[in-house]
Amino acid sequence: MTDSPATAKIAVAAATYWVDRPFDYRIPPALADKVVPGVRVVVPFGGGNRRTEGIVLSLGTAQSGMRLKSIASVLDASPVLSPEMIRLAVWLRERYFCTVYDAVHAMLPAGLWYQMESVYTLCAGFDRESAYAAAGKSAQEQLVLDAVFAHGGSCPLVDLERLFENVSPARALQSLVRKGVLETDSREKRRVGDKKIRMVSLTVSAEDALLAADRREKRAPLQSACLRLLCTLDRVSFSELCYFTGASSSSVNALVKAGLAEITQDEVFRRSVLRSEEQSPLPVLNEEQRAAFEGILSLYDGEHASASLLYGVTGSGKTSVYVHLIDAMRRKGKASILLVPEIALTPQMIRIFSSYFGDDIAVLHSSLAVGERYDEWKRIKTGRARVVIGTRSAVFAPCSDLGLIIMDEEQEYTYKSENSPRYHARDAAKFRCASSNALLVLGSATPDVESRYRAEKGVYHLFTLKNRFNARQLPSVRIVDMRQELRGGNGSEVSGVLLHELRENISRGEQSILFLNRRGAASLVACGECGYTYSCPHCSVNLTWHSVTRRLVCHHCGYTRALDDACPECGGLLNQFGTGTQKLEEHLREALPDVEILRMDADSVSPAGSHEKILSQFREKKVPILIGTQMVTKGLDFENVTLVGVISADQLLYCGDYRAGERCFSLITQVVGRSGRGAKPGRAIIQTFTPQNPVIGMASRQDYEGFYAEEIELRRLQNCPPFSDIVTVTVSAEDESSVLRCCTYIRDRIRSELRGRKDAAVLGPAPLPVVRVSNRYRYRVTLHCRFDKEIRTLVSGLLIQCNTAKEYKGVLVFADYNPME
């Protein structure tokens, strides 16, 4: 009796959600030692056996009679995912309706991703003459052969497509393959490789090297200089050796040939982030901070997971508590992850934490170059860095011995991914802490209503910092009624009160931050005579005027166009309506012509490193005014900022989302908290057309407890989280009637299946706020319920059915759990 062949269960990259499952593959004997859980492999998949990437989930043995395809090759020398991260990927699939490989893809840095590249190779038995003879008179086939021979007999498809420009080479390639002239295969190509540097070192003793240098002093002075430098430094990079001695590569190679030196390849890490060189003592904690630190740390025993909510007013010193917690974990030999909601916050956090932990810090966020992010990932995985700072995806950092995850500003919606997998970093952090028996700390001045409710119910441990550090006062806040400004003849976006306070700040050498949550210059360009407006041809939205680029832009699909000199319909005068950050900047430059102003929004920070550059300018050059979107509302700590202005509070409040009140309260509270963080008292001005709104009033007083008491009752009445979960099923297609037909079927099916459940309510179909994006109509069915296994199974089945049914051809259906919009 023969042993059953070894097999592996593999999550395949090419599998869509409706066919996704662990696929069984046979492990060839030659690969038996290399195929282990967590490594990526190349496997044939589908009817055409197309080669695709996959990741090994587990190993097993084949049942008798099973006919299995074999693994073609192994891509990784060691696992890229630990067993814990594999379990997390499977869990994300169940919770967020994605494929396992979607989750794996989110966990790995782009530098590790592979592309399957098609390659066309000249078949054996063909030379140049016989190949061209087989191609005959076809100009396209001859052009393909020109490229193949120019590439040495094997040419990637991407190069052929570039050669053909606007014409596809597919027909010519198919013909040459059919004639037996070319054969096609695929190969794996990684986006970025390990960075290596050539190092030169002696292979003899220093005494022997000096003797050799003396002998070469006259006949080979450059070789002599190289040997003397190597005696001093022991090892030096090839480029530095040549630079400091003036030697060429031939001189160094001559030493290698003589057996006096050797050249080796050393791996180096690409790192662009500047870190503090001086190590500082840990910050001194006040009584409140120490109580919070000791209370949270006491929950850690290494055998049980624990979650805490650290609620502290703006400026209360939550960051100092984080520093002490991370230091305590390092002393225990444990790794820590600190999550921040915005890339703009990472430079400040790096500056603070590197002053305490030096090179033990790694940074992960999307603005890093591909090679830099890959190298930071490697530093974490190999244990060279035990403190990780990053945005949402840093929750997947490959830390071994994880002891702590901190989510700063945990209420922020940016912790929820908008693309598959549509995970929330808080949920992923909970899973990782539960798997590693680690501490989870959620920190905020305005905690998420659901988090505060869980703390109230004892699910989270609650720790509170009620006072600003060093007994500093909260900013004094003034609400300006913009209706009165209009009645007084001021139709601009800046009230007279705010302009006066800006001038006062400038005269005192103090700085100001102005917050407006809309980029661009004008949200609407319209004709004053016929009413014509510029709208996107692909989306159901108006185009936004960007004065910097002098273009009209769609913020949904990216469509742009130039602005006409006059109305294209009637030739009338075009007017701009609405205010964005660019228009606000223009207005202030007119009102304050000699004052330097910085702007921080998605348009100004698009180049890599722009966040840090703008914030460094603001800090070091004491630029008087910083204008920005929500990037400037949280986490920034500038002691010289004594004035904050909220340009339009109403813009935050009235947006048709059940979380609008919470988001408005949080943003206003956070941005007001940027003021008065140093020795000087702070002020804040909130401009609004609805000063009587209770949310704006409570935000101005920084009354979180009052806001929470009202908001939690409203959520209870609306049956919104935390009293139920929300699952949305979104349907999109170019044909609106197909979307509505599919949505109606989904709604009716859910109602039928859940008829006996009192906790379930189905709403819709309803159009999304922007119903058409990129020529696709979008409608949604919303389900309020308890998100249990029955619901997950039902929704998953509907996704599979509707995405594969012939009657819904061209329709795309996806689901989301507790979306943020």
Pin down the residues of each PLM region:
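Accessory, non-ATPase domains that flank or precede helicase/AAA+ motor cores in DNA-metabolism machines
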Residues: M1-S444, E456-R472, K789-E821
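Short beta-strand micro-motifs in enzyme catalytic cores
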Residues: A6-A8, R198, D725-V727, Y777-Y779
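Short secondary-structure junctions
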Residues: T16, L592-V595, I750-A761, A805-G810
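Short, intrinsically disordered low-complexity segments
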Residues: R40, A761-K789
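Proline-centered flexible-loop/turn and helix-kink motifs
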Residues: G153, E165, P593, K680, ...
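Short beta-strand elements
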Residues: E183, L754-L768, K809-Y817
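Inter-lobe coupling/hinge segments of SF2-like helicase ATPases
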Residues: E277-N286, R290-E294, E303-L740, P769-V771, ...
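Extracytoplasmic/periplasmic
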Residues: S737-S752
